[in-house]
Amino acid sequence: MKKLTIIFAGTAYFSMRYLDALTKSEHKVIAVITQPDRPSGRGQKIIFSPVKILSIKRNIPIFQPSELKNEKIQREIFNLNADMMIVVSYGKLIPKEILTMFPKGCINVHTSLLPRWRGATPIQSAILFGDKETGISIIKMNEKMDAGTIINSVKCNILPNDTTETLTFKLIEIGIQVLLKTLYYINKNIVVEKEQNEKHATFSKKISKKDALLNWNTEAYLLERLIRAFNPWPVCYFIVNQIAIRVWQAKIIPTVMKSACVGEIVAFNKNGIQINTAHQILNLQKIQFPGKKIINVEKIISSKKHWFHIGKII
């Protein structure tokens, strides 16, 4: 069977894992498109994307255009004569001129069961809304965001303690397998395309750091989901003594305390910092002070008892 020649477009660690698998398959990645290098951190040091780092190691030609509407870039991509393009968390729109230039098409690996959770944050959205399952969808791309025909998909259960980080790693493992299987179907010309039902389409929202501030006027179960969805980024936090404290793990205590105010600390012990919310108690178990490591709350019972005394409203 003829090996496929592939142009790969991706940027993040998630993308890099797929690129790594493709370079070890029978197919050939002849070029990579990734986002331009960007300054990061306090020192604004230029950082290469995970996809670029791997591409350098594997001696794969790299394109880093600021946008893909440039005719010169489009000609360069066309002249590579690739069979197809695979897009995994690239982060930029692919114009029609590129989508239509490959004999085998342009496919995208998306981390949801489309048409549910189109957009940039499908994993976080699935956790935030309490979905019991998510998955990977492989779609043939069109000009609309995540609206192409589905050519393969696989389900993945969401466990009660799953975070965006743990769910991402599960989706990487199953996604790589379904992508390789899809390439086999494409190579054999036995792909079956399925239109998405627009009536069932939902859209995930972009997330910013300001969304991570915990609002105790919210029910405990929603806050607990938020903490899992925002782990490992942007990480939920609350303010005490004008200090932002990150929350990495919390559990719901199904108790209603009508005598306590919203945001009031009702217990502080080895089990956690227990805070009254709009409904039920949220028990903070793993937290992080600025510049410090993540710790279990039991580690600060003695040193921070004046910070989290019972009755304090935060």
Curated annotation (Swiss-Prot):
(6S)-5,6,7,8-tetrahydrofolate binds at residues 112-115. It catalyses: L-methionyl-tRNA(fMet) + (6R)-10-formyltetrahydrofolate = N-formyl-L-methionyl-tRNA(fMet) + (6S)-5,6,7,8-tetrahydrofolate + H(+). Its EC number is 2.1.2.9. Keywords: Protein biosynthesis, Transferase. GO terms for cellular component: cytosol. Belongs to the Fmt family. Attaches a formyl group to the free amino group of methionyl-tRNA(fMet). The formyl group appears to play a dual role in the initiator identity of N-formylmethionyl-tRNA by promoting its recognition by IF2 and preventing the misappropriation of this tRNA by the elongation apparatus. NCBIfam families: fmt. This is Methionyl-tRNA formyltransferase. The gene is fmt.
